């Protein structure tokens, strides 16, 4: 789980812990491989995956981040994609341009 501003990024498969949102005003962004997750992955192989943002969200600077897909690369396929999905989501919320992920290897 990662908290970015008032956004709480959680694993779709985990129980959401509202203690991290004391005022109850968090926007919950789910990450996982379920079809109803806010963020999911497709085309997973030994080199990377396609990051899929399935609904619009707001960045910390209040810019709209539209639904989109882009490739994320890694040097070794992880056993669990949630950490990568959550870090990439956090970076988007901090206004990192998705084009940056063309040159980053996790």
Where are these regions (language model features)?
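Flexible active-site lid/hinge loop adjacent to a nucleotide/diphosphate
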Residues: 1-30
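Adenine nucleotide phosphate-binding catalytic loops in nucleotide-utilizing enzymes
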Residues: 29-106
């Amino acid at each position: 789980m990662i908290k970015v501003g008032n956004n709480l990024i959680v694993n779709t498969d985990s129980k959401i812990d509202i203690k991290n949102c004391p005022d109850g005003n968090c926007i919950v962004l789910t990450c996982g491989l379920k079809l109803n997750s806010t963020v999911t992955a497709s085309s997973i192989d030994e080199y990377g995956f396609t990051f899929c943002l399935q609904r619009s969200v707001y960045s910390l600077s209040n810019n709209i981040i539209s639904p989109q897909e882009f490739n994320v690369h890694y040097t070794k396929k992880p056993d669990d994609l949630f950490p990568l999905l959550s870090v990439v989501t956090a970076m988007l919320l901090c206004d990192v341009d998705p084009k940056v992920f063309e040159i980053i290897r996790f």
